[in-house]
Structures are given as structure tokens and as C-alpha cells.
Regions:
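C-terminal binding/interaction regions
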Residues: 20, 124-178
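Structured binding/interaction patches within domain cores
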Residues: 1-139
Length: 178
């Protein structure tokens, strides 16, 4: 469960009663797509003939460019998550990251789903002794990609939703891990 019971109005679009502008919604979608794309090879190495996660990332970006409607991007996200379901480990998490990225068009808060699943994919791809450091590096890499205009919003949201995102954004002591 990556979505909170109580929505943050800063992550609800203006047309739905929140304060999130379309421009910032687009930035969140692009960032989520970047996070998912960064780990996509962990899926494609295992499932080279399945392009559903790649198409989901492409649809997320196409939605930002107004080339596809929200429902098309969201549907592509569902197909990517369908590609994830029969798998295990890094490939599964990478496909889920792509699916979450495409669903940002529908619900902006899926941005952290894409980021969290990407971090989990990296962690699942390495030996347990290397896991914490690999996940920390991925988290920091993601934060380095954040557009300045939404950086504080995303970092605050990571802090707020860390517990429901498998604690990948901060250690169990509440401190930021990256």
C-alpha cells in the first residue's frame, strides 16, 4: 500500500480540489518515469520479449506531452503491473515501478510508488550484504533527479509516507537514509 488514507492536498490537482498545478503534476510524472527507467533493465534482462513496462514509461511521458489521455497512460500502467505479477525479485519490482510511473497521470501520489519499487528492485538485485548501500545510492540518485520546483514536496512526502513505502526512503530510526 503506497497511497495514504488521508490525501495531502498539495498532491491533489487543482481541478479535484487540491493545490497541485498541471505543470507540477507533469514534473512528478516525468520524475517517476525517470526512476522507473533507471531500473528497467532488471526486468528486460529477465523478460526481453515483454515490452509492457517500457511502454508504460513511454505512455507516462506521452501523457505529459498531451499525446495520450490519462486513461491510456493508466491502462499502460496496469499492463506493466500485469507483467510484474508472475515474477519475483528485481524484475517484478522494476515492472511495478514502470506501472506506478504510468499511473501518476491518474493519481500524482503514485510517483513514490515508482520510486519505492525502483529502490526495492535495486535492493533485490544485489547480495544481502550490499543491499542497504545499493538502496541508499539508488534513493540518492533519485533525489538528485528531482526537479527543483517539486523537490521539497517530494522529500516531505517521502518522509510522510515512508512507513507505507517499505521504509525505503529513510532508515527505521526516521533519519533520511540518503
Amino acid at each position: 500500500m503506497i497511497l495514504p488514507e488521508v490525501r495531502d492536498p498539495r498532491l491533489v490537482t487543482i481541478r479535484r480540489g487540491g493545490t497541485l498545478t498541471d505543470a507540477d503534476h507533469h514534473l512528478l510524472a516525468l520524475w517517476a518515469a525517470t526512476c522507473a527507467e533507471h531500473v528497467l533493465d532488471l526486468f528486460e534482462t529477465i523478460q526481453p520479449g515483454d515490452d509492457r513496462p517500457r511502454r508504460a514509461i513511454e505512455h507516462a511521458r506521452a501523457w505529459v506531452r498531451s499525446e495520450v489521455p490519462m486513461m491510456v497512460s493508466r491502462a499502460a500502467g496496469g499492463h506493466a503491473m500485469g507483467a510484474a505479477r508472475p515474477l519475483r525479485g528485481a524484475a517484478r519490482f522494476a515492472a511495478y515501478a514502470a506501472g506506478q510511473a504510468a499511473c501518476v497521470a491518474h493519481v500524482p501520489e503514485h510517483d513514490l510508488g515508482a520510486a519505492a519499487y525502483a529502490i526495492k528492485a535495486v535492493g533485490a538485485a544485489v547480495a544481502s550484504a550490499e543491499r542497504e548501500e545499493a538502496m541508499r545510492r539508488e534513493c540518492q540518485w533519485q533525489r538528485d533527479q528531482l526537479p527543483a520546483r517539486v523537490r521539497d514536496l517530494v522529500l516531505e512526502d517521502q518522509e510522510r509516507r515512508n512507513d507505507i513505502c517499505w521504509s525505503v526512503f529513510a532508515g527505521h530510526d526516521g533519519q533520511r537514509s540518503c
